[in-house]
Amino acid sequence: MQNEIKKVCVIGSGVMGSGIAALIANSSHKVVLLDIIAKDSDDPNKIVKTAKENLHKQKPPPLSFPDKVNFITIGNLEHDLELIRDCDLVIEVIVEKLEIKHQLYNKIIPYLKEDAIIASNTSTLPLKRLKENLPDNIKSRFVITHFFNPPRYMELLELIIDSMVKFEVIERVSGFLTKTLGKTIVKCNDTPGFIANRVGCFLLELVARKAISQKLDFVALDKIFTICLGLPSTGIFGLYDLIGHDVMKLISSSLLAALPANDAYHKIYVNTPVLDKMIEKKLIGRKGEGGFYRLSVSNGKKIKEVININDLSYSSVQKVDISFNNLDELLVSDSVYGKIFTEIITEFYVYLASLVPSVTDNIYDIDAAMKLGYSWKYGPFELLTIAAKDGWNSVIKNADLMHIPLPQYLGNKEYQKIDKQKFNSHKDILQESQIVLENDSAKLINYRENFIFVITTKMNCLNHNVFYLLQEAASKAEKDGKNLYIYPQGNNFSAGADLKLLLSYIEDGNFHDLENLLKLGQQTMLHLKYSGVHIISCAKGVALGGGCELLLYSSYIVANQELNAGLVELGVGLIPGWGGVTEMFVRSKGDKTKLIRNVRNIIEQNKTSSADYFKSDYDVESMHVNMNKHYILDEALKLNLSKKIVPIPHKITLPKINLATEIDTSKYNDLQNKVLSKFQNIIDKHPDTNEEELLGYEREIFLELAKDPKTIEKLKAIVK
């Protein structure tokens, strides 16, 4: 693509800046990371060098694979400005002080390519202020790209532009942020706090200050907001602690300074001395000595405690029972918490109404910002379709929402998000397709003359009917000379076997049918492996157990970077039974080092934290890693694969090796040692073998483990 962004410079190597640099490196793009000179060291790059080194230490890890750090070149703002010259995008991530930002812009402008885009990661300063006194040719390619922390894991990105920004600049930067970095963009008007923090912090401050003034139970309120409104398990007060009371004060102070006096944020931000007192005593949340909650240790056990706002003492969190189980019940409840919730939610929607269209004219962007930036299950406007219409009547009336085109959505269970990202959603694909084959667990569809296999079970779990239809689909694809694409519904590729089905066989002592299920799965995997056409798996989310085996037997994988995949069956007392053990032995190719690694994958339940790790740890050769999970099918369909060279079954020679001496088993439990012994037995007694024999040994071990009472206990614990 012409003018494609190939190299990026990030200025500012703090947690956010280095995190953005790591994200870019994860996409295998070159990135320059610059910062000021260290005044207390002979090494001018000490600050940025330390930041780069810390990328290997942070939790959760910013890098998808250790080697990705090699895409990052470091330097300082005195000696290394020349490194900017060939960068297509420069992202500024420095202190939130306008004067310092302006000084930086003036310093780097002489080094910019004539079509380089400048972006600020500010979360508080207006775009119009950032652009003050800049040349027009810079203003036309200057935007705000507000990443959320941590950049690798938070999908939301707020993009702020104005009328001066050229259309081609918007297209270039948007394409890079979505397709290359995997972000979902919400376009915001140039208003204080943009969308997510303006809405999210308003609700946090509203609830916290009202709860303190009315002496409400924090634990009860958190439970209400989690169960009834779909907030994450942190609730309101846990999230306040997670962000940090000191940070919340900075954000709110910044917003209040920028917002007009008639904005409702001023009204709800009532003086609450106890919050200031908590900050004084370093009770600022998780990074301090406590917050609204804290964790203490008693007799080696962690205990969650909640603060007593009167004297700032703590007591253990007690279980609270609320009298409603969903939003419908809450909105019509006459209880104290029902009334206070209605009061809060009305005030919240009054504020939301005031933001349309000044902050955004698209209510779907508000929903996306809260779901992706604050991890809400539903966006606030989407919630209007979740609860019964009658429950919202008073809220809508009091909040004056009628000037927003909402009534058509009330009670509409088919609430449809307006999709501006130009990718094909699962729903779109199904709507545009014709069903070729179908049963109660899967379907084969024809999508734009391509065969797509879709599993329709919960979490895409595997069972008989999935395997039957998959074999039929592969045969159909082979007959028609078309590749077969396995594409997941929902957010995950496959959670593996249907454990309820396995448990029912084991509890009934029906090991004959269990073995037949193992054989069916193994036959299906071999069918895929030796098919005359490519079997291309589009993997995202989790691919565990049988889901991982399905990937290993595909001829090509297009995987989202955040894929979590692995052979984890030992966690329920079993081993991979649909060819996973066999394929790990086959992929060792007689090499001792590979065999040790592959055996450990199974015994240590190696669930990889990224597609890069899966490719390395599981010896996957034919894989394309993609940063945006929404584009995996699009990218798979664009693959220009040569005709498949069908592998030929061959003799497998296992190396002479003593696994117990080559692997550190000091932390292994009895089950792990037992399985290791079983694998050693195969190596010792069957050094020259083949796939069919290995599959037989695999079934034999699986069935023996299935008869262990401890396996039943583990399965029951998970299936509950």
Curated annotation (Swiss-Prot):
Query: What is an annotated GO biological process for this record, any one?
Result: catabolic process
Q: Which family does it belong to?
A: In the N-terminal section; belongs to the 3-hydroxyacyl-CoA dehydrogenase family.
Q: Which SUPFAM superfamilies would you find in this protein's record?
A: 6-phosphogluconate dehydrogenase C-terminal domain-like (SSF48179), ClpP/crotonase (SSF52096), NAD(P)-binding Rossmann-fold domains (SSF51735)
Q: Which CDD domains match?
A: crotonase-like (cd06558)
Q: Which reaction does it catalyse?
A: a (3S)-3-hydroxyacyl-CoA + NAD(+) = a 3-oxoacyl-CoA + NADH + H(+); a (3S)-3-hydroxyacyl-CoA = a (2E)-enoyl-CoA + H2O; a 4-saturated-(3S)-3-hydroxyacyl-CoA = a (3E)-enoyl-CoA + H2O; a (3Z)-enoyl-CoA = a 4-saturated (2E)-enoyl-CoA
Record the organism. Rickettsia felis (strain ATCC VR-1525 / URRWXCal2) (Rickettsia azadi)
- Using the UniProt annotation, give all residue ranges assigned to the region (3-hydroxyacyl-CoA dehydrogenase): 1-384
Q: Which UniProt keywords apply?
A: Fatty acid metabolism, Isomerase, Lipid metabolism, Lyase, Multifunctional enzyme, NAD, Oxidoreductase
Q: Any keyword Oxidoreductase?
A: yes
Listed name of the protein: Putative fatty acid oxidation complex trifunctional enzyme
**Gene Ontology molecular functions:** 3-hydroxyacyl-CoA dehydrogenase activity; delta(3)-delta(2)-enoyl-CoA isomerase activity; enoyl-CoA hydratase activity; NAD+ binding
Sequence segments annotated as region (Enoyl-CoA hydratase/isomerase): 453-720
Which E.C. number(s) belong to this protein? 1.1.1.35, 4.2.1.17, 5.3.3.8
